[in-house]
Swiss-Prot record:
UniProt KW keywords: Acyltransferase, Cytoplasm, Transferase
InterPro entries assigned to the protein according to its UniProt record, in alphabetical order: Acyl_CoA_acyltransferase, Leu/Phe-tRNA_Trfase, Leu/Phe-tRNA_Trfase_C, Leu/Phe-tRNA_Trfase_N
Any single Gene Ontology cellular-component annotation: cytoplasm
Gene3D superfamilies: Leucyl/phenylalanyl-tRNA-protein transferase, C-terminal domain, Leucyl/phenylalanyl-tRNA-protein transferase, N-terminal domain
Biological process, per Gene Ontology: protein catabolic process
UniProt protein name: Leucyl/phenylalanyl-tRNA--protein transferase
Enzyme class, first EC level, given as a word: transferase
Organism: Idiomarina loihiensis (strain ATCC BAA-735 / DSM 15497 / L2-TR)
Catalysed reactions listed for this entry: N-terminal L-lysyl-[protein] + L-leucyl-tRNA(Leu) = N-terminal L-leucyl-L-lysyl-[protein] + tRNA(Leu) + H(+); N-terminal L-arginyl-[protein] + L-leucyl-tRNA(Leu) = N-terminal L-leucyl-L-arginyl-[protein] + tRNA(Leu) + H(+); L-phenylalanyl-tRNA(Phe) + an N-terminal L-alpha-aminoacyl-[protein] = an N-terminal L-phenylalanyl-L-alpha-aminoacyl-[protein] + tRNA(Phe)
Amino acid sequence: MIVQLDPASISFPPAATALHEPNGLLAVGGDLSPGRLIHAYQQGIFPWFSESDPILWWSPNPRAVFFPDQIHTSRSLAKTNRKPNWQMSINCNFAEVVRACADERADKEGTWITEEMIEAYCKLHQLGYAHSVEIWFDNELAGGLYGISVGRAFCGESMFHYKTDASKIALLRFAQYFKKHGGQLIDCQVGNPHLFSLGAVNLHRERFLMKLNIAQQKKMPDTFWQARELPLPGEL
């Protein structure tokens, strides 16, 4: 049975009570207030719904994740990544990254990144919880990703690319940077062939929640999410 959330409370039912079909559906309702969203991600729960739906909350089993030191890099991607034209930045253009992700998904299959979602995540960004990674090619935005920080875990929400391989390079370089500074886990929610080809693995929900709980016992260094251009791969 799906739980209807109490508008006056930010609490959620235990993730283990989520439905088997559709996989991971846990609750409906509530809002996208910063407090509720932060609490959800800390519990391994995330919102995912279309414009015509009520707010739906999920915690699927299994859960797809990346371990930062296990991103798969093909020869061609490694060669592309070495080109000096690429540059990475962090938190330099959050709103544009989110909107680019929304536009890319809308072109393919319709987007769940609605205006309501964009506004909610921009608020989280202003509060220091939501972050973007930008990849530039010859000083033009070429791709990127965004997500939510939960201690030393990063809950990825979406990626986009204007240029071939740009989103892969964003993930690869971010994972290297994240690992070097103590990052432990990159959540990618629900796996697909593309994510698995890059090194994502499925964890049983119970194991994922255990790792998420461990990761959020410590914060990333204070300067980690500071908006800036980041060094070249060999200097990360």
